[in-house]
From Swiss-Prot:
The keyword Protease does not apply. It catalyses: trans-4-hydroxy-L-proline + a quinone = (3R,5S)-1-pyrroline-3-hydroxy-5-carboxylate + a quinol + H(+); L-proline + a quinone = (S)-1-pyrroline-5-carboxylate + a quinol + H(+). Belongs to the proline oxidase family. The modification N6-acetyllysine is found at K310, K320. The gene is Prodh2. One of its GO terms (molecular function) is oxidoreductase activity, acting on the CH-NH group of donors. One of its GO terms (biological process) is proline catabolic process to glutamate. This is Hydroxyproline dehydrogenase.
Amino acid sequence: MIWTRLPLYGHSKPSTGGWQPLRFDGGAFHLKRTAELARALLVLRLCAWPPLVTHGLAFQAWSQRLLGSRLSGALLRASIYGQFVAGETAEEVRGCVQQLQAIGLQPLLAVPTEEEPDSAAKTSEAWYEGNLSAMLHCVDLSRAVADAHGPARNSLMQLKVTALTSPRLCKELSAWIQRPRGSSELRPERLAEAMESGRNLQLSCLSTEQNQHLQASLSRLHRVAQHARAQDVRLLVDAEYTFINPALSLLVAALAMRLDSSEEEGPWVWNTYQAYLKDTHERLERDAKAAHEAGLAFGVKLVRGAYLDKERSVTQLHGKEDCTQPDYEATSRSYSRCLELMLRRVSNHGPRCHLMVASHNEESIRQATRRMWELGIPLDGPVCFGQLLGMCDHVSLALGQAGYMVYKSIPYGCLEEVIPYLIRRAQENRSVLQGARREQALLSQELWRRLLGRTA
């Protein structure tokens, strides 16, 4: 549940004219160079090969031993890294963003960090402090690219809470939150006050060491939020695993309370809702109503969800009831219901309610654009769209050329850090990668058209 006061965007004219269904037929590929299309086709086909995704880290290690680090790195930069990553330096990121904005797309920068540190060194406060520095730099970079190439009011970036606090602590807090007597001790107001004052909460459910880590985590979150607000950058908080999401929602709600100001506009922090969970529509409706009753703005990033396999394996391991939708069709119905709920709230409550339709599904995009027109929601208003860099360009480009606000999620960083991150994200998004067959077909069609010299 995330709330802040006042609108993010000014009032603008609603969508005019008759609604025309967008054509996701690859027609907008004329904006891309042939080399970019060829790389996209090659990489997407590789990523749709299950063994490569499953054993990606092993393949990377094998290629380094066989080819050497330099040649292996060059091949990765020319393929997977170049397709999905903006670059390593600030200049490379700026160049990538400039290319995107030239074709009607906006950046949503992301620091590639792992939510489950896999070594003792990465569980220390020093590792989280290093992530804090990276997040603060991401805020600065998000503002810099907006100032250079686009409207600063639309600056957004992704924030992964478990880059700044331990997943184990979040799991402990989540378990406590779900107990009847735990809810009174763990109130967002208490955490928000601790963020501001710096005083240790001394929660009874945590050990001394855990309380100290919680206080340090609150301080880190507060610093990122304050800096983002000062730079006019909005924070979109990533969803994570169900067993830690209650704690993440608590932390985000506390964070939003610290950002509430009558002198600034809009939802500074947006939470992510995963449609593949059975209770998402109910939670979304409850949170939206609570925000409205409190007179606060409400920001939502709506996704289908990327942790299905892990969620089900954890459920089976602990003998718990499956919290996920039974199949993709049920998830799509859930997404459609949540989308309709949020679009109606945007229509009824104007700039106090904001939504990112984060989806690669063409039918969901069509539903959103049709309902925006029917409800009179302006194209440059409180509803925007989001897709991953290097994927779903036939949808992103069509939306951007039609005048919608479209963001590409853009990781950046050095090869050694980003490749393991990309492989793990690919493992989480197997269904998306394997479902990109239509995009591959459109890319192939466009490449053949160019090779044969045919007109579009």
